């Protein structure tokens, strides 16, 4: 029927869009993709239309009796819920760390406002790792010290690199850039304690 054909077409469009967004993200960065694709009204509407059609098909055809189809449509709805949680409740930004300077907040990407962190973080040192025998950078590594809420006298040490994410209190820190003098470090901050987990559950 027309509804099924429309659902298939929208599925194909969504998959193609997500694939294209992956390449765009590699070329222009995560902030660009989120601002121009993931966090736009038309993208949310696309997800909403697909979810609505899938839900109608699920009810009208009693698809809950066919477990594989139920699992497929159910996972789609779970992914949509996770995406909406991320859209409405997540925070993203960046923090600039300097050696020996304690930071307790980060700057939000969209609003430019300072948002508090539930803990403090300090850069101990930053270094660039090179491929053996070359001057080609292999990794950027920030060595940090942080303290947990209510435990300021308890200092914990961690390192953040291109392939190593630091997670604490629902905040995820990614190594993104560094100062020209090679001393300061820039970290991307992502706060999404529920949305990411719900979305991953849908894919599983």
Spans of features found by a protein language model:
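Solvent-exposed, non-transmembrane regions of integral membrane proteins
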Residues: 3-204
């Amino acid at each position: 029927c027309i509804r099924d054909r429309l659902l298939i077409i929208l599925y194909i469009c969504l998959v193609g869009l997500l694939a294209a967004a992956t390449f765009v993200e590699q070329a222009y960065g995560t902030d660009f993709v989120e601002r121009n694709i993931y966090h736009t009204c038309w993208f949310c509407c696309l997800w909403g239309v697909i979810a609505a059609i899938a839900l109608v098909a699920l009810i009208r055809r009693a698809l809950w009796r066919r477990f594989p189809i139920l699992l497929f449509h159910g996972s789609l709805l779970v992914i949509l819920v996770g995406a909406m949680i991320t859209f409405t409740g997540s925070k993203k930004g960046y923090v600039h760390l300097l050696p020996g300077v304690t930071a307790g907040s980060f700057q939000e990407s969209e609003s430019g406002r300072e948002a508090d962190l539930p803990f403090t973080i300090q850069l101990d040192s930053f270094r660039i790792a090179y491929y053996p025998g070359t001057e080609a950078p292999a990794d950027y590594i920030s060595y940090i010290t942080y303290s947990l809420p209510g435990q300021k006298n308890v200092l914990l040490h961690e390192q953040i690199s291109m392939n190593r994410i630091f997670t604490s209190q629902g905040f995820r820190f990614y190594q993104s850039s560094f100062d020209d003098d090679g001393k300061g470090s820039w970290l991307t901050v992502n706060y999404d304690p529920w949305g990411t987990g719900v979305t991953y559950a849908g894919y599983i």
